[in-house]
Amino acid sequence: MKDSWNSTSIIPFTFSSLIFFLFTFDFQDVFGVPTKHLCRLEQRDALLELKKEFKIKKPCFDGLHPTTESWANNSDCCYWDGITCNDKSGEVLELDLSRSCLQSRFHSNSSLFTVLNLRFLTTLDLSYNYFSGQIPSCIENFSHLTTLDLSKNYFSGGIPSSIGNLSQLTFLDLSGNEFVGEMPFFGNMNQLTNLYVDSNDLTGIFPLSLLNLKHLSDLSLSRNQFTGTLPSNMSSLSNLEYFEAWGNAFTGTLPSSLFTIASLTSINLRNNQLNGTLEFGNISSPSTLTVLDISNNNFIGPIPKSISKFINLQDLDLSHLNTQGPVDFSIFTNLKSLQLLNLSHLNTTTTIDLNALFSSHLNSIYSMDLSGNHVSATTKISVADHHPTQLISQLYLSGCGITEFPELLRSQHKMTNLDISNNKIKGQVPGWLWTLPKLIFVDLSNNIFTGFERSTEHGLSLITKPSMQYLVGSNNNFTGKIPSFICALRSLITLDLSDNNLNGSIPPCMGNLKSTLSFLNLRQNRLGGGLPRSIFKSLRSLDVGHNQLVGKLPRSFIRLSALEVLNVENNRINDTFPFWLSSLKKLQVLVLRSNAFHGPIHHASFHTLRIINLSHNQFSGTLPANYFVNWNAMSSLMATEDRSQEKYMGDSFRYYHDSVVLMNKGLEMELVRILKIYTALDFSENKLEGEIPRSIGLLKELHVLNLSSNAFTGHIPSSMGNLRELESLDVSQNKLSGEIPQELGNLSYLAYMNFSHNQLGGLVPGGTQFRRQNCSSFKDNPGLYGSSLEEVCLDIHAPAPQQHEPPELEEEDREVFSWIAAAIGFGPGIAFGLTIRYILVFYKPDWFMHTFGHLQPSAHEKRLRRKQ
């Protein structure tokens, strides 16, 4: 019985002891299993306080993720997105908010820099957001930082000198902002290895304190306004691998000490004002240099023979070098790794023999640019010579004075890119060109070609899948119909045959290209018939202006969901206003000028339209007062916030840029490239009547407004005073009455205005812009008077001023604000408009990422890619 009692009493004792053991024993010490502690409460609270200062810009698109959405009060901050903690202490060590769609204006009291609860941060990454304002000096509180990345934001002001006190930093990226002034002293950051301050507005000379940074490996100063000479003792940076300072105003000679740095692999100093004789000095042996770009400077003299010592060179750009003599290509034969060679615009006095060059031993080169030099090429060669030593992939011969198509190219079966534009080549384009199996890009523009050889179609039949993607043949003398072989180029993305003498209709077989064709330019030909009804689902730009096209706009265009530019000007199209095009969510440019369009301009909400030209048609009727309420791209609702980065339409496409002709400041001007922030509205030379809609004042981003030669009546809306970006205003040749609104005198960008041939009266506004106009701008308005008018029209009659202005003018300001309120009150409509806004301004899809914009790769990202 005793034994039984003992056994039953031991069991509960042993179990309770085991529970106690499990809860108290530190298994981590035995098994080495890490357990993440809960984050510290004061740090969680600090992060939540920080979150309140951020606004998430929605929608958040590809490549961007709203990191702070996972931050919640009832969860462990160590598990939040963008947060890395110490596994033992729970201390927040890393804060990564990059690409998070965050917007905030920083100031001296911003929580991020003032809370001491995050003082042990080692990494702070705010890159690729929409942060603005100035960096406060208290950033030095983060004394443990090793990585600080503020790149690709909108930070302004000077770079705070206190950053130089962050002595533990190894990585600092301030690129892609709006910093101004001189760089502060960074000489105490002895651990720094990577420094990027490119793409700002920094001034002054080369920051000499940087020469103290002995561990520096990557240095980028590009795209600023630095001046003066580069230091002669650049060799102090003995660990430098990557040096970029292109796009500044550096002068003086190229410091030869650069080439004694044994670790240096990349130098880019293009687009400066460096001068003198090109010399490389004592080159380190063996040289590790792989990239050398010193193009677009003011160097003179021959290419130094010592360049042959750069035995690992892969990319060499010496373009725009004033060689003042012949080019000795033998100096490149020792560069066995050379792949890209740019010798364009050398100002050489001799002719480059392409045949001799192709017979040389530059076998590693796959891309060569000789544009802007005198180049000769034997056109008649034997079959035995069809196998040159040199096989090249990319050849650029633009503006080389070539008069016949180089026959030697027919054996270049590895060629992918051929630019032979801006020469004097006449006759027909040879059929064998299209048999080159890897050919992707051909530029034949600005020559004297008359047609394509008949053997072209036979040549294409020999290729299973033609690879051609870009065919540019503009500004030639091509005649006859559009060649049918083009329909067989089923990978074609860009087709430009503009400015030729082609006739006939657009072939229906071009529907074969509906899956790939993005840019079609056939303007300035003699094409007739109707527009194709095929659905080019990838079409982004269609320009068929200045032809003889008839009929109507195909209603199938409503399914061109990718369309951004539609230009049908100067044809014979007879149709009503295509209001249905407003459903195209990406349409930005619409040009219907000089056709036979007629009837009313129906009310339509063109949310994304930035340029519209309806001039020289037969449109009639009135425009309702709220006509422009939802034209968001021309209003501040979709205005780009990046004024410093002037981006053009088609920037992401190297081989094609949209253009448009507009009446601007009284002159017909061609915009060879279209700025993304440029906006214009031209309704001139029609039969429109009634009052000018007061909602015109909502278009605050408008640059050009032309309503001339219509039958508008009533007063000029005072709401036009809201058009803060307006540069050109033409309301001449109407029946307008009343005064010129005084508010127009406050428009500082308004350089041209025309009020002539109306029934205007009263005081002409003051202001510099009005005083700079010609007298003709006010002609045939006998009731106008004022000092501004007296200055531009010497002898005028000034009637007595009226005592009372019409009550309509007194109410206009209130009414335009009513339209603004109405616009804001449109609930779902405005949400839809804002969605389109962000698509246009902040969406960065793959096709938009090459140059783009504000989300271009930073210098250190490019560097990392090279290492991979």
From Swiss-Prot:
State the taxonomy lineage. Eukaryota, Viridiplantae, Streptophyta, Embryophyta, Tracheophyta
- Name the membrane topology term: Single-pass type I membrane protein
Kindly indicate where the leader peptide sits in this chain: 1-32
A Pfam cross-reference name: LRR_14
A GO CC annotation recorded here is:
plasma membrane
Alphabetized PANTHER family for the sequence: DISEASE RESISTANCE LIKE PROTEIN, LEUCINE-RICH REPEAT RECEPTOR PROTEIN KINASE EMS1-LIKE-RELATED
Residue intervals on the Cytoplasmic side: 837-868
Entries under SMART domains matching the protein: LRR_TYP (SM00369)
Q: Which residues lie on this side of the membrane: Extracellular?
A: 33-815
LRR repeat segments:
118-142, 143-166, 168-188, 189-213, 214-237, 239-261, 262-285, 287-310, 312-334, 335-360, 362-385, 389-412, 413-436, 438-459, 465-489, 490-515, 517-538, 540-560, 561-586, 588-606, 607-630, 675-699, 700-723, 724-747, 749-772
Cytoplasm among the record's keywords?
no
- Main subcellular location of this protein, as a coarse class: membrane
Of which family is this protein a member? Belongs to the RLP family.
Segments traversing the membrane: 816-836
- Glycan attachment sites: 73, 109, 141, 165, 233, 275, 282, 342, 347, 477, 503, 574, 613, 706, 746, 754, 774
Q: What is this protein called?
A: Receptor-like protein 32
Any coiled-coil regions, as ranges? none
Q: Subcellular location, in the record's words?
A: Cell membrane
Sorted UniProt keywords: Cell membrane, Glycoprotein, Leucine-rich repeat, Membrane, Receptor, Repeat, Signal, Transmembrane, Transmembrane helix
- Organism expressing this protein natively: Arabidopsis thaliana
* InterPro entries, sorted: Leu-rich_rpt, Leu-rich_rpt_typical-subtyp, LRR_dom_sf, LRR_N_plant-typ, LRR_R13L4/SHOC2-like, RLP23-like
